[in-house]
UniProtKB/Swiss-Prot annotation:
Disulfide bond sites: none
Name of the featured protein: Argininosuccinate lyase
UniProt organism field: Clostridium botulinum (strain Langeland / NCTC 10281 / Type F)
Residue ranges that the Swiss-Prot or TrEMBL entry lists as coiled coil: none
Keywords assigned by UniProt, alphabetized: Amino-acid biosynthesis, Arginine biosynthesis, Cytoplasm, Lyase
PANTHER family: ARGININOSUCCINATE LYASE (PTHR43814:SF1)
InterPro entries: Arg_succ_lyase_C, Argininosuccinate_lyase, Fumarase/histidase_N, Fumarate_lyase_CS, Fumarate_lyase_fam, Fumarate_lyase_N, L-Aspartase-like
Group of enzyme by EC: lyase
Enzyme Commission designation: 4.3.2.1
Signal peptide extent: none
Length: 440
């Protein structure tokens, strides 16, 4: 049974039927579809469009279908065009002809737009929850490992930071991601139900009522836009892509830091895998997969942008292609956030190797230049002097702090005994604005 066909002389080909069906993926929307129908039916009786006893039968049937799906009694499968026809046809089979009144004053165009918005809201809230859990772990692990480590530019050791402060940089990225998602929730918080196919309805339906019942701030202002808007899907996948970019950057650093060349951290066994041929291997596959899946979410974004780029108003069947990219991007970002939280919460940090890398990288060179500036030398001259000292140290295979005062004075008479305290790593990280890094 189809929800349409009266104006057709010939049957739809089986090839076209299969090609047209979206049930295999839009079945994810069964909960939202039924909840939207429940709200619609309650509105219909309030507006005296259907009778009270009809409403009761329809609501009971919808609630039974929802329960049967949740309990696995009713399988979402079969020869149905989409989740909307699956629910409606099963309702009619369950309660009889009164079920045919469910769709009064409604189109599948506003129905699917509603389903997707409800699903997008729920999905976004789930992503925000996962972000918060990851941010909590970053703070906790950072506070437990507030060790001095090299900070990098161009992947070259640059200045001293702390492991905690480095993790907090990612905390800031994810905090921005959370703000972006909350802003997106506010923008999409308008109900399209009641927009009809594109031009509303001749029935005096109450869009304000259904919007409130379904948790929306208000109904959409324009029917055409209500059924054809997919901006919120594009916006959310775009924001998911930024989250994935942040996760990928963090993954890259974790992969580097866990390598034998760095040995700053150990990734827990629970988030690593081995080699089928090399018994000694412990691979950071969790982080590598997150890094790889970032491109997958980018692909979802480009896919939906391409679908929407040339569509005239209002609804077009092209828009059926909005669901799989969104479902995939949402599932991917949630799984990656959960895995990253697991990786972070089980990290082991090698304090000694962090400090060894600090000692080898002339990470107090900027502070040594600042010392000369404080003694009256122009910064550009101080920069040159310290650069010459670094060359001298490299030739001697020593650090700046290992040079004697006599050696330092070969480069400038401004050096005094207090230079050693000034360029001490633990001391320098608590000078000036560096105190904001919170080393303790």
């Amino acid at each position: 049974m189809k929800l349409w066909g009266g104006r057709f002389k010939e049957e739809e080909s089986k090839l076209m039927e299969d090609f047209n069906s979206s049930l295999s993926f839009d079945k994810k929307l069964y909960y939202e579809d039924i909840k939207g129908s429940i709200a619609h039916v309650k509105m219909l009786v309030n507006q005296n469009i259907i009778k009270e006893e009809e409403k009761e039968k329809i609501l009971l049937g919808l609630e039974e279908i929802l329960k049967e799906i949740d309990e696995g009694i009713l399988k979402i499968e079969g020869d149905y065009e989409d989740i909307h026809s699956f629910v409606e046809i099963n309702l009619i089979n369950k309660i009889g002809n009164v079920g045919k009144k469910l769709h009064t004053g409604r189109s599948r165009n506003d129905q699917v737009a509603l389903d997707m918005k409800l699903y997008a809201k729920k999905s976004t809230e789930e992503v925000i929850k996962c972000l918060k859990e990851l941010m909590d772990s970053l703070i906790k692990v950072g506070n437990e490992n507030n060790y001095i480590m090299p900070g990098y530019t161009h992947l070259q050791r640059a200045q001293v930071v702390t492991f905690r402060y480095h993790l907090l940089a990612y905390f800031e990225m994810f905090k921005r991601d959370e703000k972006r998602l909350k802003n997106a929730l506010e923008i999409l918080n308008e109900s399209p139900l009641g927009s009809g196919a594109l031009a509303g309805s001749t029935y005096s339906i109450d869009r304000e009522y259904t919007a409130k019942l379904l948790g929306f701030r208000k109904p959409v202002d324009n029917f055409l836009d209500g059924v054809s808007d997919r901006d919120y899907i594009i916006e959310l996948i775009s924001k998911f892509s930024i989250i994935m970019m942040h996760l990928s950057r963090l993954s890259e650093e974790l992969i580097l830091w866990s390598s034998s060349e760095f040995r700053f951290i150990q990734i827990g066994d629970a988030y690593s895998t081995g080699s089928s041929i090399m018994p000694q291997k412990k691979n950071p596959d969790g982080a590598e997969l997150i890094r790889g899946k970032t491109g997958r979410v980018y692909g979802d974004l480009i896919g939906i942008l391409t679908v929407m780029k040339s569509l005239p108003l209002a609804y077009n069947k092209d828009m059926q292609e909005d669901k799989e990219p969104f479902f995939d991007a949402k599932d991917t970002v949630i799984s990656c956030l959960k895995v990253m939280e697991g990786i972070i919460s089980t990290l082991k940090v090698n304090k000694e190797n962090l400090m060894k890398s600090v000692k080898k990288g002339f990470l107090n060179a900027t502070e040594a230049a600042d010392y000369l500036v404080n003694k009256g030398m122009a910064f550009r001259d101080a920069h040159k002097v310290i650069g010459e000292i670094v060359i001298y140290c490299e030739d001697k295979n020593s650090a700046i702090e290992d040079l004697s005062l006599e050696e330092l004075k070969q480069f400038s008479d401004l050096f005094c005994e207090d230079i050693y305290g000034f360029i001490d790593y633990k001391s320098s990280i608590n000078k000036g604005i560096k105190k904001e890094m919170g080393y303790f």
